[in-house]
């Protein structure tokens, strides 16, 4: 039989933390509806100004990224966006630089690209599962910083 040590009341730094209340479904739906309207307006501007827009959704597995994305894109013009799920890297992608598959998914001018999963999610997952060393992780972070700077500088 085993026992776990547990701090006494008052010994834990989380004792005084006020956990936020989860919004009710109606509030969530209202927020999604508002975001969808704003995104539809933005999509028109993106098309007119010929801007490429990359939207990356990251989060825990089974957190609902896909269902949120489905709700958000439901009313968008499908001619001007695409969706990709960034699964584990393929054998070909493993032979290429870490950010290759993300460069390959960059949207063309006037379109959105929604990525379900992103480079930080992949990098953190690889470190967590022992597939890369701390040094490789640090190199990956530097690559990400350069990639994000290129995206910001070049629209």
Q: Where would I find each of the regions flagged by the language model?
A:
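Glycine-rich phosphate-binding loop of ATP-dependent small-molecule kinases
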Residues: 2-155
């Amino acid at each position: 039989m085993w026992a776990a040590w547990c701090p006494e009341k008052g010994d834990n730094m989380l004792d005084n933390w006020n956990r936020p209340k989860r919004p009710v479904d109606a509030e969530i739906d209202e927020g999604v509806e508002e975001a969808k309207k704003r995104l539809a307006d933005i999509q028109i501007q993106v098309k007119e100004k010929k801007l490429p827009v990359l939207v990356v959704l990251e989060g825990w597995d089974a957190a609902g990224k896909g269902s949120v994305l489905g709700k958000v894109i439901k009313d968008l013009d499908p001619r001007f966006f695409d969706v990709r799920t960034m699964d584990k890297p393929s054998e070909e992608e493993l032979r290429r630089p870490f950010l290759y598959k993300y460069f390959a998914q960059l949207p063309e001018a006037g379109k959105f690209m929604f990525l379900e999963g992103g480079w930080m999610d992949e990098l953190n997952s690889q470190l967590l599962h022992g597939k890369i060393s701390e040094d490789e992780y640090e190199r990956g972070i530097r690559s990400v910083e350069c990639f994000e700077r290129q995206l910001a500088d070049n629209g």
